[in-house]
Swiss-Prot record:
InterPro entries assigned: Znf_C2H2_sf, Znf_C2H2_type
Positions carrying Phosphoserine: 85, 96
GO molecular function: DNA binding; transcription cis-regulatory region binding; zinc ion binding
Keyword ATP-binding attributed: no
Lineage: Eukaryota, Metazoa, Chordata, Craniata, Vertebrata
Region feature (Disordered): 1-118, 492-541
Gene coding for it: ZNF513
ZnF (C2H2-type) ranges: 150-172, 178-200, 206-228, 360-382, 388-410, 416-438, 444-466, 472-494
Name listed for the protein in its UniProt record: Zinc finger protein 513
UniProt-listed Pfam families: zf-C2H2
Domain of life: Eukaryota
Tissue specificity annotation: In the retina, expressed in the outer and inner nuclear layers, and the ganglion cell layer.
Associated disease: Retinitis pigmentosa 58: A retinal dystrophy belonging to the group of pigmentary retinopathies. Retinitis pigmentosa is characterized by retinal pigment deposits visible on fundus examination and primary loss of rod photoreceptor cells followed by secondary loss of cone photoreceptors. Patients typically have night vision blindness and loss of midperipheral visual field. As their condition progresses, they lose their far peripheral visual field and eventually central vision as well.
Length: 541
């Protein structure tokens, strides 16, 4: 029965085969010794099946070799798959039948029975042994290869991904392929359009787990959650900036725990310095409001008295968050509902610590914030600057959000609907105020009497009875009042129809001389009709 061929045959003895010095095959006992046959890496197999078929008793035939009775050379015979001359075969190592083939040298890990580790992607050798990943760092540790960076030629934008750079270049080219189907809004990125559509639907998918706060942007939620993180950090000794809360310490990576892995020094040169450097002397990049810090001359006019603090705070004085229309206030300080509950509970809620903890404060009112862009936006309220104007009417505002809210008056859009009745409106604050009718809640209480109401404007108007302030003064006669509705009714006596001040049209944004004109006019000029007067009354509060 024929034997199965071996996958890795060992050198064997072949009786009856002898190789003489003339490279001819003669029959005779002895060992098989061929200088050109048994080279390292060649597998020789006996074809015993063919021997049985031919009936030869001598094992004279090898795989690829045929016996030549005439004594021809092996290198010139066509039976060889490729010929080897004496010169070519001399480069190999001659083996005898008794010699053993030496195995290639193994690494220290293979000698212990371990598998070799992954090869280095740069040099192909074992990881940690090549010149690219060998000991060359300051501490003798391996050096990590630098990552490929894609940088913008027009600005300092840098990214590790080419797709991010392509998306960023649309910012410079002005291309805005994503357009809103309800308004003229267009954006270069789909994520911005998705965020914008929530302004039409009123959707607020991001909710704070610690309080009822909800918003439509993840960035606003993260900024809000800093108010729950704890006490603020110490102020900067150079510019006085104070962060809202310290960032939590990043846990060290496993590589850092075992030992610091230094990067190449030239890697740090690939990334530009994107940190904000504020020069000494404060926030000089904010709008210059030097003309507002005078002695009341210029815009306010000589002899004008300051407006009572009850009328013009539009932001929470506890956390700096901008208050919506109809949101609560207290005597002498407007505050949001969360800060009011925090003060009622003795400040144990972990909320903001007050205006003293803010890095940027307004010099004209108690407004303070952690962010310089919020202060710059707030200063437009005092300066009277209104860069956002309506294309359908003379309305103008200092804030883009107010303009968007105003445009719903023209379009008739009412995205906010009451779940208990058919009421719908275009302003979220109006929906909240309407919801108090169903709940019967009256969160606005007077600290001097038992008066309470469900709208902040009613509380502000009520507080004028205690203070005796009458900010609305007629320029034609000596009439003064504390209510805008009464003032409009009085203007009909002079034939102005309540649309504006004496001799001024509604588009000029009249403000009573008893108060700084920039404050009352910053929320939009009076408009014709009942809707316009209601909007002015809300803004003046």
């Amino acid at each position: 029965m024929p034997r199965r061929k071996q996958s890795h045959p060992q050198p064997v003895k072949c009786e009856g085969v002898k190789v003489d010095t003339e490279d001819s095959l003669d029959e005779g006992p002895g060992a098989l010794v061929l200088e050109s046959d048994l080279l390292l890496g060649q597998d020789l197999e006996f074809e015993e099946e063919e021997e049985e078929e031919e009936g030869d008793g001598n094992s004279d035939q090898l795989m690829g070799f045929e016996r030549d009775s005439e004594g021809d050379s092996l290198g010139a015979r066509p039976g060889l798959p490729y010929g080897l001359s004496d010169d070519e075969s001399g480069g190999g190592r001659a083996l005898s039948a008794e010699s053993e083939v030496e195995e290639p040298a193994r690494g220290p890990g293979e000698a212990r029975g371990e598998r070799p580790g992954p090869a280095c992607q740069l040099c192909g050798g074992p990881t940690g042994e090549g010149p690219c990943c060998g000991a060359g760092g300051p501490g003798g540790g391996p050096l990590l290869p630098p990552r490929l960076l894609y940088s913008c030629r027009l600005c300092t934008f840098v990214s590790h991904y080419s797709s991010h750079l392509k998306r960023h270049m649309q910012t410079h080219s002005g291309e805005k392929p994503f357009r809103c189907g309800r308004c003229p809004y267009a954006s270069a990125q789909l994520v911005n359009l998705t965020r914008h559509t929530r302004t039409h639907t009123g959707e607020k998918p991001y909710r704070c787990p610690h309080c009822p706060f909800a918003c439509s942007s993840l960035g606003n939620l993260r900024r809000h959650q800093r108010t729950h993180a704890g006490p603020p950090t110490p102020p900067c000794p150079t510019c006085g900036f104070r962060c809202c809360t310290p960032r939590p310490a990043r846990p060290p990576s496993p590589t850092e725990q075992e030992g610091a892995v230094p990067r190449r020094p030239e890697d740090a040169l690939l990334l530009p310095d994107l940190s904000l450097h504020v020069p000494p002397g404060g926030a000089s990049f904010l709008p210059d409001c030097g003309q507002l810090r005078g002695e009341g001359e210029g815009l306010c006019g000589t002899g004008s008295e300051p407006l009572p603090e009850l009328l013009f705070p539009w932001t929470c004085r506890g956390c700096g968050q901008e208050l919506e229309e109809g949101e609560g206030s207290r005597l002498g300080a407007a505050m949001c509902g969360r800060c009011m509950r925090g003060e009622a509970g003795g400040g144990a809620s972990g909320g903001p610590q007050g205006p003293s903890d803010k890095g940027f404060a307004c010099s004209l009112c108690p407004f303070a914030t952690h962010y310089p862009n919020h202060l710059a936006r707030h200063m437009k309220t005092h300066s009277g600057e209104k860069p956002f104007r309506c294309a359908r009417c003379p309305y103008a505002s200092a804030h883009l959000d107010n303009l968007k809210r105003h445009q719903r008056v023209h379009t008739g859009e009412k995205p906010y609907k009451c779940p208990l009745c058919p009421y719908a409106c275009g302003n979220l604050a109006n929906l909240k105020r309407h919801g108090r009718i169903h709940s019967g809640d009256k969160p606005f209480r007077c600290s001097l009497c038992n008066y309470s109401c469900n709208q902040s404007m009613n509380l502000k108007r009520h507080m004028l009875r205690h203070t005796g302030e009458k900010p609305f003064r007629c320029a034609t006669c000596a009439y003064t009042t504390g209510h805008w509705d009464n003032y409009k009714r009085h203007q009909k006596v002079h034939g102005h129809g309540g649309a504006g001040g004496p001799g001024l049209s509604a588009s000029e944004g009249w403000a009573p001389p008893h108060s700084p004109p920039s404050v009352l006019s910053s929320r939009g000029p009076p408009a014709l009709g009942t809707a316009g007067s209601r909007a002015v009354h809300t803004d003046s509060s």
